[in-house]
């Protein structure tokens, strides 16, 4: 716990280097690279940020990630055939392929959980764990696949992908691939210019968009967990109990009674109790004796039936003879 702040500082400084020892092949970079196809990528070794014009308003700031216009601009730099192939195969299939590439990268480097050669290897292990957990949570259960075919990935565990898409997944930085999912889901969750809109698919796209945004922040080290009771407002359990405690004060007798607030025919509320009538609030309920349904209702809670009293055996149990 003492080295938490130092690790956070090293995350920003060291992840952008993306350098490994000369003996091993380099791992997949995590930070954003130039947003274009690997086949048509320009040679620029010092570029580890989003490559665009200097005056492009989408290059920096929050709109760089969340603006629909910025997302459409980034997707326009990718081939339309590859985007159509991603939608055809499904986001779950593409993301599973992406996770498999992360696993193979770590296995090729012989990186173990117990030992790390440098900080970058450790950070790749963390990102790999985060992405695997994300896949199991969002694509591994039928509940998260609502509005989609739940057997799409199960029947096609090794889909046939084009060489262009395979190269893109293998050579593109981690955050850039996640950004592609964010931009495509943002476009899928937009109503503008669409006919015969599938409401369920729209809700699913928006749900997954928010999930991938959280994944993006977790992978680059900027995600901050928040208290659910503060975010959910009235839906949180703590606020629910607080509302009930204000409604039913502690000094009110029988505050858990279902008849609270009801009005009798005489106009008096059941919750209004005089001191003269209150005798013992702790023992107002008496258990119903066994077999008492055979007798008059007036004798159920006032006294035991005479026949029931005479039928007690030596063990003390009230059995009928």
UniProtKB/Swiss-Prot annotation:
Ranges annotated as biased composition (Basic and acidic residues): 1-11
Superkingdom of the organism of origin: Viruses
Protein name: Uncharacterized protein R562
Composition skew (Polar residues), residue ranges: 34-47, 241-269, 310-321
Compositionally biased intervals (Low complexity): 227-239
Region (Disordered): 1-63, 223-321
